[in-house]
Amino acid sequence: MTRLTRRQALASLASVGAVALAGCTEGAGGGGGDGSGATVPAADARLPLPMEPAELREAAVSGGPDKDGIPSIDDPSFIGASEAGFLADGDPVFGVVRDGVAKAYPQKILAHHEIVNDELAGDPVSVTYCPLTGTVLGFDRGGTTFGVSGRLVNDNLIMYDRATETWWPQILATAVPGPWNAEPEVRSLREFRLVWTTWKRWRDQHPDTRVLSRDTGHPRNYARDPYGDYNPRDGYYAGGAPLFPPLREDDRYGPKRVVMGARAPEGAVAFLKDGLRDAGLLTGQLGDVPVLAVHDPRHDTGYVYRNPDEAAYEAVEGEVQGPSGTTHAPNALPLERVHTFDAMWFAWAGFYPETNVYE
């Protein structure tokens, strides 16, 4: 079967104004930032990188569209669950709850935009999605916004912030040099968890959820994902090789098998999502620290916790029983949680070749 390039996939939607593809030169569209003087909020500690920041710039490739050729949603609007008739029960959504307010971001909309600059409980945030690596991550953005650079590294979206025009590879969540800011401070973004689940699962748990509207200000056919489909799984998402060669290849698992990955300054760890689903609980090691991975059947997702004392926990009918006999929701164990997210195996292994993997 002929592999479809990212440019071809996106160009296939040109008839509905999907993406204006331009000639990609590395300096195109640069300009020293928006003049706001805003600072992107940074994490307390830097996350690990697979190579030197300058080497990551050298490894970056054009994804097809130029800077902002895939337009972020900068003025999102939301509707109620009863108005979201365009979503089928099995369609993926990316969910978050803050201060009692639930929001769902449909994957079929994010596939066309990759970034939504939004607010949660008054806090400015960016919801980011990379279709090629199957990753969704949330970041605090401070007084600026994030945009799509048009470049990829390890097939992963490289974002840029509009205040300083620094490059930020999504999975790494750490600044690297780019054509518009050659010497950024190397620091990591402040993250928050988004849950990759289905519309039905999210709606059942959060009937009052707000849903990102298709009224984005951009002419798009949101019924069509240029890469394939998740409901049922088809096209790029169904399997096969990534569009571009990954930084490193690891054939222990199929390239697009999904892992629940967690990384911290001390290292990275991954749990096969289907293995975690079957087991309910899995133990592993993040650097020198024992960790516990927990499956949450409510959303078919997973959480990873530091468990330095290796306390005994047990999955019991959708909850987790602790050593004292008390039960906890899978997302609320009395342990320190490590930021965890879904990722395609090739992308995780390419960025974190020394990762421990458990199934």
Where are these regions (language model features)?
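Mid-to-C-terminal functional-domain signal that highlights helix-capping/loop sites
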Residues: 29-359
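N-terminal secretory signal peptides and thylakoid transit peptides that target proteins
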Residues: 1-16
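N-terminal Sec signal peptide cleavage junction
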Residues: 23-24
